[in-house]
């Protein structure tokens, strides 16, 4: 809404996409090819296949230097979860065993397979992270 109000013509409205789908809308590969993808609070409230699809498609769609930005809570290796995130993770897994906080190392490994470099991690309020992956030049 703010982008439309401010006349930011280079920001499209949010798209409803099945992240796990084999194919994404053809328009994303043509007139609406993204320079960045911003995904907020999705990969922990979806099956792992959704994270895999998001990273795979982002790797195909984004140009070198393009950004994939993920926002939300993550597990961080062997670090214990904060009590609030531990309770949230348990609640998610109780509602659906395919849901839950994802390990950042596993997400980064998927990103590397899709052609992204090491993530830049920004600590955010409420034990969330902004994780920025940049697409690397083709090898």
Residue ranges and their predicted role:
Residues 1-26:
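Class I SAM-dependent methyltransferase SAM/SAH-binding core
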Residues 3, 97-115:
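Short alpha-helix
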Residues 28-33:
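Glycine-rich phosphate-binding loop signature in dinucleotide/nucleotide-binding domains
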Residues 38:
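A conserved beta-strand element that flanks and buttresses the S-adenosyl-L-methionine
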Residues 45-61:
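A short, conserved alpha-helix within the catalytic core of class I
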Residues 62-77:
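Conserved beta-strand signature within the Rossmann-like core of class I S-adenosyl-L-methionine
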Residues 81-105:
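Conserved Class I S-adenosyl-L-methionine
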Residues 114-139:
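Core SAM-dependent methyltransferase catalytic element
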């Amino acid at each position: 809404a703010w982008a439309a109000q401010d006349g930011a013509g280079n920001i499209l409205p949010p798209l409803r996409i099945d992240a796990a789908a084999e194919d994404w809308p053809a328009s994303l590969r043509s007139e609406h090819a993204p320079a960045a993808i911003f995904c907020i609070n999705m990969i922990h409230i979806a099956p792992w296949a959704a994270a895999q699809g998001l990273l795979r498609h982002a790797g195909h769609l984004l140009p070198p230097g393009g950004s994939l930005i993920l926002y939300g809570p993550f597990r961080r290796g062997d670090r214990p979860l904060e009590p609030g995130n531990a309770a949230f993770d348990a609640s998610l897994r109780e509602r659906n065993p395919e849901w839950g906080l994802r390990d950042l190392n596993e997400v980064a490994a998927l990103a590397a397979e899709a052609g992204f470099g090491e993530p830049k991690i920004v600590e955010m309020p409420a034990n969330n992270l902004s994780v920025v992956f940049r697409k690397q030049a083709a090898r």
